[in-house]
């Protein structure tokens, strides 16, 4: 004997599942996130390709430093995920005070963590890099550019946090625009500065790239 549901309940459930407005909103959010992800991947792929043009040893040294950045991202992305969930819930409930509280709490923790990670990696990098490569020239290049990687980590928390906040608030278009603009700036400045200053110029462009993402999203923040 099958389970019977009232027709009105079935219709209500169908309308909730097949709500075109909400479905299109979901499609738009996911498409924006996809573009943002492609822009992120493209940025780091371009950074690696540009480093390769400066020589195999430079490419290897940059790859070592990117491991520190990747490691830090696991920590900072955790705070961004918490901000996405908790600030997103407050935003959906139209609770402005709670929204600001959640943003402030998670951002302060992320900033402290980023500072500790940056200082820790800068202080320990000269000891850990030799474990990652046996090539002395690669080691020296990596240690020489270690301050730029540490600086990137320190300033990157803002972009991570704002990404999480905007995703939670389903304001993904701003996040997409910020990442695409930052990618264009990275390619333009990276091409210019790497030609003038070599790998130092390339790293400075990467730091500017992550900063631009945060600055642009900060300009969008008042719409939340």
Write out the residue ranges for each language-model feature.
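Transmembrane alpha-helix boundary and packing residues in multipass membrane permease domains
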Residues: 33, 37, 45, 49, ...
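Short loop-to-helix capping motifs
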Residues: 55, 135, 171-172, 198
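Short runs within selected transmembrane alpha-helices of multi-pass transporters and secretion channels
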Residues: 1, 77-80, 149-168, 174-186, ...
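Small-residue-rich hydrophobic transmembrane alpha-helices
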Residues: 61-123, 158-170, 174
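Short alpha-helical transmembrane segments in multi-pass integral membrane proteins
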Residues: 1-31, 87-152, 192-224
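Helix-terminus/linker motif at the lipid-water interface of multi-pass membrane proteins
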Residues: 38-71, 89-90, 127-136
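Hydrophobic faces of transmembrane alpha-helices in multi-pass small-molecule transporters and flippases
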Residues: 15-46, 71, 75, 79, ...
């Amino acid at each position: 004997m099958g389970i019977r549901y009232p027709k009105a309940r079935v219709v209500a459930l169908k309308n909730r599942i097949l709500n075109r407005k909400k479905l299109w909103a979901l499609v738009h959010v996911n498409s924006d996130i996809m573009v943002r992800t492609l822009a992120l991947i493209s940025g780091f792929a371009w950074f690696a390709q540009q480093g390769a043009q400066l020589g195999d040893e430079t490419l290897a040294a940059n790859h070592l430093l990117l491991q520190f950045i990747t490691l830090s991202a696991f920590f900072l992305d955790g705070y961004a995920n918490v901000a996405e969930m908790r600030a997103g819930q407050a935003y959906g409930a139209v609770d402005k005070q709670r929204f600001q509280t959640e943003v402030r709490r998670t951002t302060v923790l992320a900033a402290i963590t980023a500072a500790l990670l940056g200082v820790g990696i800068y202080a320990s990098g000269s000891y850990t890099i030799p474990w990652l490569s046996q090539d002395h020239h690669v080691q020296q290049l990596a240690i020489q550019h270690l301050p730029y990687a540490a600086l990137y980590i320190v300033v990157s928390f803002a972009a991570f946090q704002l990404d999480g906040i905007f995703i939670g608030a389903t304001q993904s278009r701003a996040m997409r625009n910020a990442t695409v603009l930052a990618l264009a700036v990275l390619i333009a400045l990276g091409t210019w500065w790497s030609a003038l200053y070599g790998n130092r110029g390339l790293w400075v462009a990467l730091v500017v790239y992550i900063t631009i993402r945060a600055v642009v999203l900060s300009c969008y923040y008042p719409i939340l």
